[in-house]
């Protein structure tokens, strides 16, 4: 039934282009700063070898990018940074680095309104539809990592339920408070059950999971804040998605030190089940895979995709993108789960 909900947002997203939400000059500058920051903040960092964050198997080294090594799990195909710099290095990076500040200010503000129209408005409609189908009444929506509060604003337009934001960054938390939202100014891992009401809850998180130093620790902490049948809806990047598979180490989505974990429709279920969640639905509603390949075609080695991009018209490309999304092979993945 979630497929029906995805169709609701189809008209909003069909013509979405990567350049609209990630203007090339701004995104390239962000990647340039991030590459410099990998040296400044991580060159001398202690690193720890880890097992696959989904199934616990021993990963196989796949490639190195900007002095970060990525392993791929041979069992579940999760792609992840290994060995992994210690948490203190990431805390320092996200607090002080030029690329983090550029993302939170210049990049985000430059694209805020187009993202509102192209991403957050249809996403709010989609989330609201999922909640309705789950038949949750008198509940709270809790946005983990709410940023500038744009998603929360769009949700408030279409629901009477409370929207609460968990946002650890002081300047972003203040922005959200000034918009009238209740804000819990903490990392999720530091949130206590006394910070929350006893109402049923729908937690949401967008494009956060791939950044987590320990996804399992995050999920265990989240589970401890939930009541049975509370739901968690989140989006992340899929290691088996088309553009990531084709571009691999040259994928702009594989961007250390930000993106550490790339789960997929198979492996995300594994980590959810072992942390106390029931996976209700996994979909890949992404709309940018083909466009991302188009924008990075000089890095494509596969002969089929080179010829496809050179010879296909826009209508053909849209048909392929729809097929990729509908069959679970987009790199943008959305998960609906609930506490057991």
What is the predicted function of each stretch?
Residues 206-213, 235, 258:
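Short catalytic micro-motifs in class I SAM-dependent methyltransferases
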Residues 216-231:
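A short glycine-rich, Lys/Arg-flanked "PGG" loop and its adjoining helix->strand segment in the class I
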Residues 337-340:
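C-terminal beta-strand of the catalytic ATP-binding
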Residues 189, 210, 219-223, 236-239:
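Rossmann-like adenosine-cofactor binding region
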């Amino acid at each position: 039934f979630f497929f029906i909900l995805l169709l609701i947002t189809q008209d909003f997203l069909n013509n979405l282009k990567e350049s609209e939400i990630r203007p090339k000059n701004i995104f390239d500058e962000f990647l340039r700063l991030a590459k410099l920051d990998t040296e400044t903040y991580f060159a001398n960092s202690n690193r720890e070898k880890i097992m696959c964050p989904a199934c616990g198997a021993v990963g196989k080294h796949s490639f190195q990018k900007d002095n970060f090594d990525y392993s791929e799990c041979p069992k579940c195909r999760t792609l992840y940074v290994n060995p992994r710099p210690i948490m203190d290095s990431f805390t320092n990076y996200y607090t002080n680095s030029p690329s983090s500040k550029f993302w939170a200010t210049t990049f985000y503000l430059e694209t805020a309104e187009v993202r509102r129209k192209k991403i957050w408005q249809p996403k709010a409609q989609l989330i609201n539809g999922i909640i309705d189908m789950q038949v949750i009444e008198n509940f709270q929506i809790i946005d983990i990592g709410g940023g500038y509060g744009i998603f929360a604003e769009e949700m408030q337009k279409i629901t009477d339920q409370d929207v609460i934001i968990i946002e650890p960054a002081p300047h972003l938390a203040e922005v959200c408070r000034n918009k009238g939202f209740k804000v819990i100014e903490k990392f999720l891992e530091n949130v206590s059950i006394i910070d929350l009401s006893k109402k049923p809850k729908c937690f949401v998180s967008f494009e956060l999971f791939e950044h987590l130093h320990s996804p399992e620790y995050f999920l265990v902490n989240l589970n401890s804040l939930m009541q049975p049948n509370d739901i968690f809806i989140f989006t992340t990047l899929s290691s088996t998605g088309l553009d990531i598979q084709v571009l691999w180490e040259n994928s702009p989505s594989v961007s250390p030190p930000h993106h550490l974990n790339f789960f997929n429709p198979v492996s995300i279920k594994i980590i959810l089940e072992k942390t106390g969640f029931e996976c209700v639905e996994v979909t890949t509603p992404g709309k940018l895979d083909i466009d991302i390949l188009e924008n990075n075609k000089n890095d494509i080695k596969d002969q089929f995709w080179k010829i496809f991009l050179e010879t296909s018209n826009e209508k053909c490309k849209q048909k392929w993108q729809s097929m990729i999304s509908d069959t679970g092979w987009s790199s943008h993945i959305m998960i609906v789960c609930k506490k057991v």
